[in-house]
Amino acid sequence: MATGDKIVTLDGLKAVYDSQDTDSIKQDVADLKSNLEAAVNGHHYGVRWDKASAQMTRTGLAADITTTTTNFKHSGSVNANYNNPFDSIYPWSGRKLCNISLNAYRVLQSGDSITDCVVAWEGDPDFSYEHEDGVWVYTPEFWGTSYDEGGYRYFDVCDKPITGYVHYPAHITARNLGVKETRTIDGASKAIVLPKLGMPCVREAMSTIHTYAKNGGMTLDSIYSLDASILLMLVEFANYNSQSTIGQGTVSLYYENDAGLIQEAATSSTVIKVLASQAQALAIPGAIIDIGTSKGGNQVGTYHVVSASTSGTITSITLNAAVTVTTDHFYSVHGHIIVADESIGSMSGYIGTDGKCDAYYRGESLWGNMWKYVLGAYKNTDEHVYLAATDADADNYDAINTSVHLDTGVALSTTQNYIKTLGFPEQSGRLAAPCFCTEVGGSSSAPVGDYFYTNVSSCPCSDRRW
């Protein structure tokens, strides 16, 4: 018998096993035990936040996954070294782009699968970024939670129902802001919004855009669908500073100035002329140009840049449509039109110049230089956050109703600045990763790395698409 061999006796029979074999058997048994536990208790992937730094520490089954996420995404161009372990971990692996049939969605019945309205998945031959009903993001069912312990905030995602965890049902959300169009629905001409390519629907009241969505049998994003995306993103990228880890969004495509005047009058022309010192860096294809009689206004109209050229001190901007302007008209730049960004697909990151293109989290443009209305969360005049108790309540209202919406007791900061402290409405039982700023005084890098804006009156809680 060789040194290191082990003798196993069973019913009086002896067998000799090499020590390496027995070690392998022990590992197999340990793996089996782990798999059995996961089958009962679920697979848990989490992060721990110290509330001082944006960077987090991984926990649970994610503990051995690197927090260096450079190759989890695309940055500027397609990443040849792309390697994201979460691509093979549920529920992240199941989040993907799809085309839907709006007509099929409108007739879904209670109990039907949300995927019954899907007509093509990303990768299918008939999937299209130019589909008549737009491009959507499917997120599969999962469970999640967050809690304080020992001075840390823990976030956890699980693939099984766990007592006390928030249940996130399978859902489909818009990839981008909606584009407004008119359709005949039930025999009537109605304005609707769909996540298609082109000019996003902006400068409309929340109630108006909500009506457009409901005209098509849809709704707007709620605090609950947003919460699902935030939780998945926090656990995957292990960092609260999403602009640093994933991409800034179109924060640099912004210009409003008293000196932002048209430099030459034109009649029914697709070309406007402006000072190069103001516009040269912003006049990129797809940038949204507002022209108006006041700074930042669009009384004349909203257009986008097709091309631009500079000669001396003047930049000539070719627009997508003809316009009549005088030298008394102002121009401003507000973000970017919706483009396909096919190289990103269902992945994360950005294609283009950081700050001048959309940034995506697993296919969804979550932030950019435009406000996004979120149903179901409101700030009251007492600065408290009020929440809709159910998805139905979130969809039924687009303004605060204190007889329906619940006071969470979370008081928002009354001043604007970088976020220092986040408030978590524990009693809601519906949110695991809410983003309510209760104290400012942080920085552009920590502990969250984002800015908090507030309003003096009761209003919807909005998500800045940054």
Language model region names:
Residues M1-S34:
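Short, low-complexity N-terminal tether/leader segments at secretion or assembly junctions of large
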Residues D126, E130-D133, D156-V300, A308, ...:
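Short aromatic-cysteine micro-motif
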Residues N380-D391:
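A short, polar/charged loop-to-alpha-helix boundary motif
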